[in-house]
């Protein structure tokens, strides 16, 4: 935040208001600042995401349970959902509530691969990782493309491809298929073959994305672009991603979660104590 003459207190208050649900123009009116200044502060603060993510990935984790889900909003105009640029992918660690991925764009392979590539980096530093998704099979399929290995058993023929050891993926199949003829899908399913030495210690009642759903509801309250009762949701995809980057930093490193009473990065063991806006704006170099 070098070369800025604005007091840190004003910048932090404005950014905090943005992450508590105040709209962009409303924040400018309340704090008597220009739209150019607020946009610049959000861009600069959001750039800390890359630095903090790199720092988080340098740590080693014994076990993680990650939930995946999607969130939808409109961008610029009202278009069919499949054409919207406002789809947001979330990957959140269940126990600590640490967000590993929070990216928006069109719901296509590029957006999914961006989130799964980040998850593959997390896998490299985690001894045992479980991924739960609520009805979206592409998470497991894309992860299989990046994190698979050939299972050599000594038998003739091509080795079978399986997920790497200690990686578990479960999908909760949505909807009832009792009215459809043919073979019925199981309620809980592994979309791809897993390593035979992977410990299968997942019970059925743990296969859910409830924490991700709760976060989605919270994000609709704390990010004005996701509210359902507004006429215009977000002007540009880049602007929507800018607000998500700011929210990612505040959620993971500044704001205490109301259930754990600790900052998610502190709860996951990345930092010893939660940070403040002053710490991030003044001391990170």
What are these regions (language model features)?
Residues 127-141, 173:
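Acidic/histidine-rich, metal-coordinating catalytic segments
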Residues 80-87:
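Short, flexible loop/turn motifs enriched in small residues
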Residues 144-234:
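Helix-centered, glycine/charged polyanion-binding patches within enzymatic domains
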């Amino acid at each position: 935040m070098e070369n800025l003459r604005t007091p840190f207190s004003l910048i932090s208050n404005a950014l905090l208001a943005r992450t508590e649900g105040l709209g962009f123009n409303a924040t400018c009116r309340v704090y008597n600042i220009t739209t150019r200044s607020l946009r610049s502060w959000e861009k600069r603060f959001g750039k800390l995401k890359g630095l903090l993510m790199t720092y988080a990935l340098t740590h080693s984790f014994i076990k993680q349970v990650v939930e995946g889900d999607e969130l939808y909003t409109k961008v610029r105009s009202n278009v069919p959902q499949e054409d919207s640029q406002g789809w947001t992918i979330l990957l959140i660690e269940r126990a600590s509530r640490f967000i590993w991925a929070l990216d928006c764009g069109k719901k296509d392979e590029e957006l999914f691969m961006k989130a799964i590539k980040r998850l593959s980096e997390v896998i490299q530093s985690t001894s045992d990782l479980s991924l739960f998704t609520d009805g979206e099979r592409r998470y497991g399929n894309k992860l299989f493309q990046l994190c698979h290995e050939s299972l050599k058993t000594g038998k003739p023929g091509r080795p079978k491809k399986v997920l790497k050891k200690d990686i578990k993926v479960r999908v909760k199949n949505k909807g009832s298929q009792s009215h459809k003829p043919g073979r019925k899908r199981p309620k809980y399913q592994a979309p791809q073959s897993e390593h035979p030495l992977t410990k299968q210690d997942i019970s059925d009642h743990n296969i859910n994305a409830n924490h991700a759903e709760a976060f989605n509801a919270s994000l609709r309250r704390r990010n004005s672009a996701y509210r359902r009762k507004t006429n215009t949701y977000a002007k540009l995809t880049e602007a929507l991603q800018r607000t998500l980057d700011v929210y990612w930093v505040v959620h993971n490193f500044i704001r205490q979660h109301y259930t754990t009473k600790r900052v998610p990065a502190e709860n996951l063991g990345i930092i010893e104590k939660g940070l403040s806006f002053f710490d991030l704006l003044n001391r990170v170099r």
